[in-house]
Amino acid sequence: MTNIRKTHPLTKIINNSLIDLPAPSNISAWWNFGSLLGICLIIQILTGLFLAMHYTSDTATAFSSVTHICRDVNYGWIIRYMHANGASMFFICLFLHVGRGLYYGSYMFTETWNIGIILLFAVMATAFMGYVLPWGQMSFWGATVITNLLSAIPYIGTNLVEWIWGGFSVDKATLTRFFAFHFILPFIISALAAVHLLFLHETGSNNPSGIPSDSDKIPFHPYYTIKDILGALLLILMLTLLVLFSPDLLGDPDNYIPANPLNTPPHIKPEWYFLFAYAILRSIPNKLGGVLALILSILILAIIPLLHTSKQRSMMFRPLSQCLFWLLVADLLTLTWIGGQPVEHPFIIIGQLASILYFMILLVLMPIISIIENNMLKW
């Protein structure tokens, strides 16, 4: 008798993507982040659902409803902090996942890569709207500053901003619609993640060497299921440590002050995972130019496959490209630091140099170094 796992229409899908999936025999821990992102998404949807049961999306009660969750709801504090810090873990996994893709040339699977970029934008949009919901000072002013960027669009900008706000400023209408979008987007993200996986399974996984591994495949279960469980345990351990020991480590103290449209905080800044893009935005003196640079800082990933000039897929055997890659990582860390600093000397010039270097590495230096490495192989 044939196993029901392999024949039933529902279990067959699970079997072919999680159990009998042929996987390369040499994929490292850098390939764990897909499953970790799935776990992050599940944690966020579940904690978010329980928070939504007690949250009210009204300017008069939003802040106090979050306080009520933390003080009066059974284990509300742990649900709230798991959701807030779960977002940070989500972005850590996202950045490492994208970094892995850049390093090992996984971007050559263009469909998977492009869906991944759409997913990144969707998660960033969700996180931004979620940050507005507690209706603290940084929530309100962050929403005001970021939505206001759309007014830089010629001709339709002002109308567009007022349409998004639902009025002439960030107010009740804005909060209500942000809550609605924040609730629906994770389900759209789940659907996109399924499409991401669908495209990946058309080609099979890449591996650290970048060499096709069709001749050497092993079943996903038990080898990679046990490996993913180890990764998941480490993720949950890190999240638990963060939530139980320093839940406010990555947050902004200003968000414990209720939103006040008459009082601007001294330094408006987003959550840490947006600081690199925020630094790029601020480094350009022109408003429209800054907005374009902000969008391009992520959208640039879409043209990475077109800029691949190397004869090798992975950076595993390309020491010069490796040096550039780690320079890019250092540059992004610098941008993250600058994004959290006030707009004054020397931070302005550091931010501008780091922004130029970011685009230089991806658009100019990487392709040139790859060509040099190709020629070095001839010597």
From Swiss-Prot:
Question: Which GO terms of type biological process are on file?
Answer: mitochondrial electron transport, ubiquinol to cytochrome c
Positions binding heme b b562 in this chain are H83, H182
Instruction: Tell me which cofactor or cofactors this protein depends on.
Output: heme b
| Binding sites annotated in the UniProt record for heme b b566 | H97, H196
The way it spans or sits in the membrane comes to:
Multi-pass membrane protein
Question: Which residues are a ubiquinone-binding?
Answer: H201
The GO terms this record gives for MF are: metal ion binding; ubiquinol-cytochrome-c reductase activity
The family database entries (SUPFAM superfamilies) matched by this protein are listed as: a domain/subunit of cytochrome bc1 complex (Ubiquinol-cytochrome c reductase), Transmembrane di-heme cytochromes
Q: Which UniProt keywords apply?
A: Electron transport, Heme, Iron, Membrane, Metal-binding, Mitochondrion, Mitochondrion inner membrane, Respiratory chain, Transmembrane, Transmembrane helix, Transport, Ubiquinone
* Pfam families cross-referenced by the UniProt entry: Cytochrom_B_C, Cytochrome_B
Cofactor binding mode, per the note?
Binds 2 heme b groups non-covalently.
Note on file?
A: Heme 1 (or BL or b562) is low-potential and absorbs at about 562 nm, and heme 2 (or BH or b566) is high-potential and absorbs at about 566 nm.
Q: What does this chain do? A: Component of the ubiquinol-cytochrome c reductase complex (complex III or cytochrome b-c1 complex) that is part of the mitochondrial respiratory chain. The b-c1 complex mediates electron transfer from ubiquinol to cytochrome c. Contributes to the generation of a proton gradient across the mitochondrial membrane that is then used for ATP synthesis.
Spell out the subunit comment: The cytochrome bc1 complex contains 11 subunits: 3 respiratory subunits (MT-CYB, CYC1 and UQCRFS1), 2 core proteins (UQCRC1 and UQCRC2) and 6 low-molecular weight proteins (UQCRH/QCR6, UQCRB/QCR7, UQCRQ/QCR8, UQCR10/QCR9, UQCR11/QCR10 and a cleavage product of UQCRFS1). This cytochrome bc1 complex then forms a dimer.
Q: What is this protein called?
A: Cytochrome b
Q: Which gene encodes it?
A: MT-CYB
